[in-house]
Regions:
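N-terminal flexible segment immediately upstream of the FAD-binding catalytic core
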Residues: 1-73, 90-120, 149, 269-280, ...
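FAD-binding subdomain of flavoenzyme oxidoreductases
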Residues: 111-265, 482-488, 492-499
Length: 499
């Protein structure tokens, strides 16, 4: 199969007529709410990455799963692209609508279908909020582990699409590690069950394949998640440092000593001051960096680990280490971290949130590199990230009202992601690729790998109608971007024009 000319997978879509699609949906999907006027669709023109905006052809809001099947059948027959949207909190433009496509909003599917405390699992619809799962199972002393900062709003369907993580993913894993099975609706009408209620299933791991596929392979209609028992005890240490490099080295020292914290987060001075002004978490505003280290388990183990981590932090150069004295202070420490993004939004007209992953050993050097790039592009960068697993979230501060600043912020963001790749990391940790990072995929993967990605997509979506132009670039795009891998002086596909 040739992928070179599958341009529809990169945004070159067939012409469609709004009226004909609207009439077909009204005819074949009774009772469906359809938004089609400019006033109605404006609220859906972006996801959490509000710098990118496109108004869709139509917005559909089904309330029954049979309607989802019928919507996909109509779009399949008319060859109309479909972008699926959950809560719209994504930060990479993954749910950015297409001007020639239908936006399928799954937000009304908010029912928790079943809770099995003995089997430690819950079966939920895709529009259920992440935090709502933990709230629903709390009476059973259980919770759902992945906890992205947007957990009060983000949906579990969106979490599956992006393979979301959170501040506790170092110990408890990403979304993919906390799923048992999902129900998926394909564009051609086929329904699949991926995974099972058992902890392992024979055959290819299609559940893992779909998790993080950003709505490019199918539409998630039901999710069965694993539940964990709440730890009897959780303690948080807050360590202050006079340099981000020392804080970065301390992260590696903790892990090297065989300690796996429930959460291990870092913030630099700019983000510390912003969060403290916003939340009053008790952060030291004179520190160049802080580490938040949460240890959980049984009382005796936690007490021992707290003493060990305290010593490790001081030996690594911490100027001060504080142990949260009670649950209220522990919650306050975490509130500052979880509200760091909106806190930074209060000190800058706009900010651009990046998401890259690096090996822990590379943390000090990458932080130095980001500081150099910040000076080069004359844009401030606040660093907030999951230090334990090297998942960085540099926040690039800019003013969109200043001509050229957003373009400069985009370019700086791209350079930071390429720096992550250079040191053996990845251009995404949990936010996905979407439209935002599609060019950097050309730096992360070679042409053979990208061709394989397209082959996988074509196996599930041969017409390329599910969320086209996202996640996977065409080879043409990589040629234009100029980032295709050159091996022994040989440039793949030399017949493609370079720009």
């Amino acid at each position: 199969m040739s992928i070179l000319y599958e341009e529809r997978l990169d945004g070159a879509l067939p012409e469609v007529d709004r009226t004909s699609v609207l009439m077909a949906l009204r005819e074949h999907v009774p009772g469906l709410e359809i938004l089609h006027t400019d006033e109605e669709i404006i609220p859906y023109e972006c996801d959490g990455l509000s710098a990118y905006r496109t108004r869709p052809l139509l917005v559909v809001l089904p309330k029954q799963m049979e309607q989802v099947t019928a919507i996909l059948a109509v779009c399949h027959r008319l060859r109309v692209p479909v972008v699926t949207r959950g809560a719209g909190t994504g930060l990479s433009g993954g749910a950015l609508p297409l001007e020639k496509g239908v936006l399928l909003v799954m937000a009304r599917f908010k029912e928790i279908l079943d809770i099995n405390p003995i089997g430690r699992r819950a079966r939920v619809q895709p529009g259920v909020r992440n935090l709502a799962i933990s709230q629903a199972v709390a009476p059973h002393n259980l919770y759902y582990a992945p906890d992205p900062s947007s957990q009060i709003a983000c949906s579990i369907g969106g979490n599956v699409a992006e393979n979301a993580g959170g501040v506790h993913c170092l110990k408890y894993g990403l979304t993919v590690h906390n799923l048992l099975k999902i129900e998926v609706q394909m564009l051609d009408g086929e329904a699949l069950t991926l995974g099972s209620d058992a902890l392992d299933s024979p055959g290819f791991d299609l559940l893992a394949l779909f998790t993080g596929s950003e709505g490019m392979l199918g539409v998630t209609t039901e999710v069965t998640v694993k539940l964990l028992p709440k730890a009897p005890v959780a303690r948080v240490l807050l360590a202050s440092f006079d340099s981000v490099e020392k804080a970065g080295l301390a992260v590696g020292d903790i892990i090297a000593n065989g300690i796996i914290p429930g959460g291990l987060e870092m913030m630099d001075n700019l983000s510390i001051r912003a969060a403290e002004d916003f939340i009053h978490a008790g952060y030291p505003v004179d520190a160049e960096a802080i580490l938040l280290c949460e240890l959980d388990g049984v009382e005796s183990d936690v007490q021992e680990d707290c003493e060990r981590v305290n010593d490790i932090l001081l030996k690594a150069g911490a100027t001060d280490v504080r142990l949260a004295q009670d649950e209220a202070e522990r919650v306050r420490f975490w509130a500052g971290r979880k509200n760091a993004f909106p806190a930074v939004g209060r000190i800058s007209p706009d900010y651009y949130c990046m998401d890259g992953t690096i090996p822990r050993r590379a943390l000090p050097g990458v932080l130095e590199g980001i500081a150099r790039l910040s000076q080069q592009y004359d844009l401030r960068v606040a660093n907030v990230f999951h230090a334990g697993d090297g998942n960085m979230h540099p926040l690039i501060l800019f003013d969109a009202n200043e001509p050229g600043e957003f373009a400069r912020a985009e370019e700086l963001g791209g350079k930071i992601l390429e720096l992550c790749v250079e040191v053996g990391g990845s251009i995404s940790g949990e936010h996905g690729i979407g439209r935002e990072k599609i060019n950097q995929m050309c730096a992360q993967f070679n042409s053979d790998e990208i061709t394989t990605f397209h082959a996988v997509k074509a196996a599930f979506d041969p017409d390329g109608l599910l969320n086209p132009g996202k996640n996977i670039p065409t080879l043409h795009r990589c040629a234009e971007f100029g980032a295709m891998h050159v091996h022994h002086g040989h440039l793949p596909f030399p017949e493609l024009e370079r720009f």
